[in-house]
Amino acid sequence: MVIHSGVDRHIRGQSAVMIWIHKSISNKIDHYKLWNNRVIETRMKTQRGHLTILAVYGVTEGREELNGVFYDTLEKILDIVNKNDYIMLIGDRNGRIGNNGVANIVGTNGEATAIYYRLTTIR
C-alpha cells in the first residue's frame, strides 16, 4: 500500500512525502491522514499497542516562513497523537549537516531540527 501526499507533477521535487506499507501488514492500518504536502500520519496496530508513523519532508533551512509552518504542523500532530502510541518519525528533514552532535539525539542534524528536538520530548 502506498500513501502519497499527491502534489502536482509541476511542483515535484519541491515537496512531497510518501509512505509504503507492505501488503502483509496493510490490514493493521488503523487510519492515515495527509496533513499537507510535507507530513503524513499513519497509525497501525502492533503486538505491543499502536505505532504512529510520521513521514515528513522538511523545508530546506533558510526558508523561515515555510520552516515555521512545517514545525508548527509537526507540533500540532504530536500534541494530539495518543500518548500511549509508539512514535516513529521518518523522512528527510532537509537539515544542513554539521559536525556538532546534540546530546540524546542521534546524528548530526540541521540547526532547526536540533533546536526542535531539544524543545520537544522526541529523542
Enumerate the predicted regions with their spans:
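A shared catalytic/ligand-binding motif for oxyanion handling
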Residues: M1-R123
